Curated annotation (Swiss-Prot):
The name this protein goes by in its record: Succinate dehydrogenase [ubiquinone] iron-sulfur subunit 3, mitochondrial
GO CC aspect terms: mitochondrial inner membrane; mitochondrion; respiratory chain complex II (succinate dehydrogenase)
Binding site for a ubiquinone: 227
PROSITE patterns named in the record: 2FE2S_FER_1, 4FE4S_FER_1, 4FE4S_FER_2
Organism whose genome encodes this protein: Arabidopsis thaliana (Mouse-ear cress)
Annotated ranges, domain 4Fe-4S ferredoxin-type: 202-232
Coiled coil: none
Catalytic activity: a quinone + succinate = fumarate + a quinol
Needed co-factor(s): [2Fe-2S] cluster; [3Fe-4S] cluster; [4Fe-4S] cluster
Keyword Transit peptide: yes
One GO BP: mitochondrial electron transport, succinate to ubiquinone
Length: 309
């Protein structure tokens, strides 16, 4: 088993079987039922299949398919050195289909000092968020662009303090998320020690809200957050605010709405640019959630309380 495969923690799989698994994701079936209804994720699956087909075709014509990747580098141990883009040439015929596969191959074979975050490799943890060819996304879900005539440029999430290379400081992002109090708040426990029950209809209202993986792609693509990171919570935090405002089990929904609308630096700092929705790797729509909270506040729409099931 090669050093790359050891780093990836997996064995060589059957290419034909892998293609069948990816094909099943286009309809949300097979091994990927969670992709059903997520257009952005299904588009990524289509791009991956296309990338694999093109790479396989080129592999049959040439022994190697070299592509250039320009990666942002900066070492805090050398504070007098300016950041720069370092070029790496990777053979796509011996690499996985995603950008994260490229980074792991580079770290294993070319430069062990390359720093980046990664964990699940399944688009669940949000660790490997970065900017790839000008778009914030997670590297494990971003297919490699098979066009070898131009390089792929990989940089850290924009307008964030860089710790090293592709690793950024997310402290403020998590603090803004925490300020939304993302947990169930009730005035009294349910009778007889039961769990807080919820009807299927009320549970359906949370779809498209709870799936956030806190990758910070949306927040770091928002100009309002760029210029006011200490005051404006950002799209990810506001999406979570709406998630709990929409939860029928929560008994502080009015207070939550008041907390984010009493100051112009909160929900009203959003200018509806919608970069957040365009860049979300999970296909969520923070801009819509923010608009709905504005509407609830401006129209004085009372939040309907529901009875326990």
């Amino acid at each position: 088993m090669s050093s790359v495969l050891r780093l990836l923690g997996r064995r060589i799989c059957n290419p034909a079987a892998e293609k069948v698994r990816l094909s099943s994701s286009l309809s949300g079936g097979g091994d990927f039922p969670i992709l059903n209804g997520h257009k952005a994720a299904q588009d990524l699956s289509k791009d991956t299949l296309k990338s694999q087909d093109i790479t396989k075709e080129k592999e049959g014509q040439h022994k190697e398919v070299k592509k250039e990747f320009k990666i942002y580098r900066w070492n805090p141990d050398k504070p007098n050195s300016k950041p720069f883009l370092q070029s790496f040439f990777v053979d796509l015929s011996s690499c996985g289909p995603m950008v994260l596969d490229v980074l792991q191959k580079i770290k294993a074979e070319d430069d062990a000092s390359l720093s980046y975050r990664r964990s699940c490799r399944e688009g669940i943890c949000g660790s490997c968020s970065m900017n790839i060819d000008g778009t914030n996304t997670v590297a494990c879900l971003k297919p490699i662009n098979p066009n070898t005539s131009k390089p792929t440029i990989i940089t850290p999430l924009p307008h964030m303090y860089v710790i090293k290379d592709l690793v950024v400081d997310l402290t403020n992002f998590y603090q803004q998320y925490k300020s939304m109090e993302p947990w169930l708040k009730t005035r009294k426990p349910p009778k007889d020690g039961r769990e807080h029950r919820q009807s299927p209809k009320d549970r359906k209202k949370l779809d498209g809200l709870y799936e956030c993986i806190l990758c910070a792609c949306c927040t770091t693509s928002c100009p309002s957050y760029w210029w006011n990171p200490e005051e404006f919570p950002g799209p990810a935090a506001l999406l979570q605010a709406y998630r709990w405002i929409s939860d029928s089990r929560d008994e502080y929904r009015e207070e939550r709405l008041q907390a984010i609308t009493e100051s112009e630096t909160k929900v009203y700092r959003c200018r509806a640019i919608k970069n957040c929705t365009a860049t979300c790797p999970k296909g969520l729509n923070p801009a819509s959630a923010i608009l709905k909270m504005k509407s609830k506040h401006l129209l004085s729409d009372p939040l309907v309380r529901t009875e326990s099931v």
